[in-house]
Regions:
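Extended, charged helical/alpha-beta scaffold domains that provide interaction surfaces
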Residues: 1-200
Length: 200
């Protein structure tokens, strides 16, 4: 009785903490006044740093596929004279394609307002899609751990640990989806001045 009530409250508290963090991130995107360029730079830097740490870019095909999947469909091949062992050269190539895509969207969308609207939409979509999945995951986790009453572990501690791991994984996925939405989307402006976006 009392234990399971307390457990339910603890589970709810964990979800509330995550929800507040997500809403703070959404608010930052919605009400951010100083252009979104600084936010986009941060997201790109974090995503690319993580890729540099986790991926093996000493093989040209790995670098090519990474750029094609996450940064730009416009890449034909990795330049032959690129030194794949040189971190700076690899970074420069990735950033070159990333900013080329951002500039292409600016050209396509013409006005600053439309471009910012597209950027905001791209990033909010990444946050919202992943948060919906995370809520679903937390509910399943709650049921799974709640049904393990007989295990030796403290269910609340176990829930918090798994929920935290899930939250960290979600933050990484949000970053990745933001980058892909911003760079790989196809955008066009209708005659009425509306944006049509096809997200990857």
């Amino acid at each position: 009785g009392r234990t399971s009530r307390r457990q339910t409250l603890e589970f709810a508290e964990s979800m509330n903490i995550q929800r507040e963090m997500i809403y703070a991130q959404r608010d930052r995107l919605i009400y951010h006044n100083q252009g979104l360029d600084t936010v986009i730079d941060e997201v790109l830097d974090d995503f690319i740093d993580q890729a540099m740490a986790e991926e093996d870019f000493s093989k040209a095909e790995n670098l090519y596929h990474f750029i094609l999947r996450n940064i730009s469909f416009r890449i034909n091949e990795i330049p032959k004279d690129l030194d794949l062992k040189n971190r700076e050269q690899v970074l420069e190539l990735i950033y070159q394609f990333a900013y080329r895509e951002l500039d292409a969207k600016k050209q396509e969308l013409k006005t600053k307002e439309l471009n910012e609207y597209f950027q905001r939409l791209s990033m909010l979509k990444a946050v919202d899609d992943n948060w919906v999945e995370q809520v679903d995951y937390l509910q399943q986790l709650q049921m799974a751990i709640g049904s393990q009453q007989l295990s030796q572990k403290n269910p609340i501690v176990e829930y918090y640990q798994e929920a935290y791991k899930g939250f960290e994984a979600m933050k990484r996925q949000i970053r990745k989806d933001m980058v892909r939405n911003l760079l790989l989307s196809q955008v066009q402006v209708t005659k009425k001045g509306d944006i049509i976006s096809h997200f990857p």
